[in-house]
């Protein structure tokens, strides 16, 4: 399956099973520098923040499980929650490809917050 079709299928699967505001592809595939054995690095911005820590940590794993099972890509897909990874990885993610955007203010607020954190912590330090 071609890269574009795989991405479209991933987006469709995520939207059919989870409530998300944005989906990102990052890493080597987002930069067009993938190798045949490169994994798919995907980040999701869930629509609702999960207050329960256990459930919050499990959510990206559940997305990963659906993608791996439905696409038959076991150990080839890695999914993270944009809001709970470290700021440097957050910046890497939003500098990748946003492959889905629900066009709600939440997406821009989170992205601007990430940029502000990076500027504060790394640029103007």
Regions picked out by a protein language model, each given a short descriptive name:
Residues 43-47:
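Short hydrophobic/aromatic beta-strand micro-patches
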Residues 1-22, 31-36, 49-125:
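Catalytic core of pol beta-like nucleotidyltransferases
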Residues 38-40:
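Short, conserved active-site loops that position catalytic residues or coordinate cofactors/metal ions
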Residues 28:
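Conserved H-loop
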């Amino acid at each position: 399956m071609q890269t574009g079709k795989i991405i479209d299928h991933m987006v469709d699967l995520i939207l059919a099973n989870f409530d998300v505001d944005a989906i990102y592809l990052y890493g080597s595939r987002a930069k067009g520098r993938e190798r045949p054995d490169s994994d798919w690095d995907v980040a999701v911005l869930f629509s609702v923040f999960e207050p329960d820590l256990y459930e919050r940590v499990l959510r990206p794993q559940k997305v990963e499980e659906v993608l791996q099972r439905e696409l038959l890509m076991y150990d080839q897909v890695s999914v993270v929650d944009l809001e709970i990874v470290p700021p440097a990885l957050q910046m890497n993610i939003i500098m990748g490809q946003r492959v889905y955007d629900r066009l709600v203010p939440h997406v821009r607020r989170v992205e601007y917050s990430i940029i502000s954190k990076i500027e504060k912590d790394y640029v103007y330090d």
